[in-house]
Amino acid sequence: MTKVLVVVALLVTLISYSSSEGIDDLEADELLSLMANEQTRAKACTPRYYDCSHDRHSCCRSSMFKDVCTCFYPEGGDNKEVCTCQQPKHLKYMEKATDKIKNLFG
């Protein structure tokens, strides 16, 4: 048991030391430029029921959950796969339930 405590204490010390050194090395200007670069990297999301075949992880979020890129083959015609951002039914029902609970107690 004492060995476990010693190892945990050592890990906590190492993590706190490394994080404090990393924060001290960054200046405020560098932090702001890093945040600006991160914001420019963010790409626009794909709205619900729009084509997401170009990037299947680009669907927008609803109020609680992220929509899912769902692919299917339409009936009739060609065998081309179509992908759209959709909200799964179980998540839709969960959002409706939480909204009703919020309205009940809100």
Curated annotation (Swiss-Prot):
Keywords for this protein: Disulfide bond, Knottin, Secreted, Signal, Toxin
Keyword ATP-binding listed: no
InterPro entries, sorted: Spider_toxin_CSTX_knottin (IPR019553), Spider_toxin_CSTX_Knottin_CS (IPR011142)
Molecular function (Gene Ontology), one example: toxin activity
PROSITE patterns tied to this protein: SPIDER_CSTX (PS60029)
Entry's Gene Ontology cellular component terms: extracellular region
Disulfide bonds: 45-60, 52-69, 59-85, 71-83
Tissue: Expressed by the venom gland.
Source species, domain of life: Eukaryota
Propeptide: 21-41
Signal peptide from the UniProt entry: 1-20
UniProt entry tagged with the keyword Iron: no
Localization (cell): Secreted
Pfam families linked: Toxin_35
Family: Belongs to the neurotoxin 19 (CSTX) family. 02 (D7) subfamily.
Domain notes: The presence of a 'disulfide through disulfide knot' structurally defines this protein as a knottin.
Protein's recorded name: Toxin-like structure LSTX-D8
Species, as recorded: Lycosa singoriensis
